[in-house]
Regions:
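C-terminal target-recognition/interaction regions appended to catalytic cores
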Residues: 58-174
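Class I S-adenosyl-L-methionine
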Residues: 1-97
């Protein structure tokens, strides 16, 4: 199940979900959620306008591949990734699958071109938003490296909620 098709989050994240029941009647009443239209956009979960802390921005002073980023990142409405030797634009308007090692190196972190033409990586909060966490979710007091890892290891909240709602309905019917 892809998060963009089953969770209304702009992320390409395919996962297999296994649901089991002890009672065959509950199983007979259960069905996995159906695909849904993606309504949320990148700008619903990522703030392209607001100035973030300087540590999230790339420049010629702190990034050895900044010249390539600057040359190739032109679109302010999409996500980019540094792929070890080249810049990849995700033309699907979806964030690529967030990974647990986003905070440990430069090649897995989704990048954006902000509205004021600055290049930056997603903040931990934005990564959690891409996973479907609500705006008001309070992030734990941890290092950004740990927060990126937690976001990358997370399940997509709306997908899990839809599956759980279907489980509750199946059990309630028996």
């Amino acid at each position: 199940m892809n998060a963009s098709e089953y969770g209304d989050v702009p992320q390409n994240r395919e996962r297999i979900y296994i649901v089991a029941f002890r009672d065959k009647k509950d199983y007979a009443n259960f069905s996995m959620p159906l695909p849904m239209e993606l309504k949320k956009t990148l700008r619903d979960v990522i703030d392209f306008e607001k100035k973030q802390d300087d540590k999230y921005y790339y420049s010629s002073k702190n990034c050895k591949f900044y010249k390539e980023l600057k040359r190739d990142m032109k679109n302010k409405h999409t996500i980019y990734q540094w792929r070890r030797v080249y810049v990849r634009e995700n033309k699907s308007n979806l964030v690529p699958t967030l990974t647990a090692n986003m905070g440990t190196g430069g090649h897995n972190v989704p990048l954006i071109l902000t509205d004021d033409n600055k290049i930056r990586k997603l903040t931990p909060r934005e990564c959690f938003r891409v996973q479907g966490f609500p705006k008001e979710f309070v992030l734990p007091e941890q290092s950004n490296t740990r927060l990126y890892k937690q976001a990358g290891n997370s399940v997509v909240v709306p997908v899990i909620k839809r599956i759980a709602d279907n489980i509750a309905s199946a059990v309630k019917e028996t």
